[in-house]
């Protein structure tokens, strides 16, 4: 339960584990239910196109998301995959929505074990592929 009293739905944890352990999904979009009492799965996808993921982030609404971010490691070391948690809170979203998403984030974030990086996005430049790649690949050779 978060400071805002919002709980994380069991389906949210199940979907996350399906992504993390079963590689069933490439990304998950989470939202607050209509009553603003629970964080639920809004959509899952196995589409590996990062632009398809970005298209699911609305211009005027807050969301949470998990993306299984895959990238090439330099020096011919192959691919690496990291699970990234997104808090999408666009500048154009209603203030009340931004406040409840901000105060509810910790409940979801704490429930999702195995996330490598956190990305806060208020506009699309902050969640662009290159921006996220820069964040997740820091120290890529040191793990």
Swiss-Prot record:
Where, per UniProt, does this protein localize? Cytoplasm; Cytoplasm, Cytoskeleton; Nucleus matrix
Might you report a single GO cellular component term?
nuclear matrix
Stretches assigned to the ADF-H domain? 5-137
Which Pfam families has this protein been placed in? Cofilin_ADF (PF00241)
This protein's source sits in the domain of life called Eukaryota
The answer on whether this UniProt entry bears the keyword Ion transport reads no
Q: Which UniProt keywords apply?
A: Actin-binding, Cell cycle, Cell division, Cytoplasm, Cytoskeleton, Nucleus
Predominantly, its location class is cytoplasm
Q: Which GO terms describe its molecular function?
A: actin filament binding
- Give the UniProt record's GO annotations in the biological process aspect: actin filament depolymerization; actin filament severing; cell division; endocytosis; Golgi to plasma membrane protein transport
Among its keywords, does the record have Nucleus?
yes
Q: What SMART domains does the entry give?
A: ADF (SM00102)
User: Which InterPro entries does the annotation name?
Assistant: ADF-H, ADF-H/Gelsolin-like_dom_sf, ADF/Cofilin
Q: What does this protein do?
A: Controls reversibly actin polymerization and depolymerization in a pH-sensitive manner. It has the ability to bind G- and F-actin in a 1:1 ratio of cofilin to actin. Binding to F-actin is regulated by tropomyosin. It is the major component of intranuclear and cytoplasmic actin rods. Required for accumulation of actin at the cell division site via depolymerizing actin at the cell ends. In association with myosin II has a role in the assembly of the contractile ring via severing actin filaments. Involved in the maintenance of the contractile ring once formed.
What is stated as this protein's family in its record? Answer: Belongs to the actin-binding proteins ADF family.
- What this protein is called in its record is Cofilin
The species this protein belongs to is Debaryomyces hansenii (strain ATCC 36239 / CBS 767 / BCRC 21394 / JCM 1990 / NBRC 0083 / IGC 2968) (Yeast)
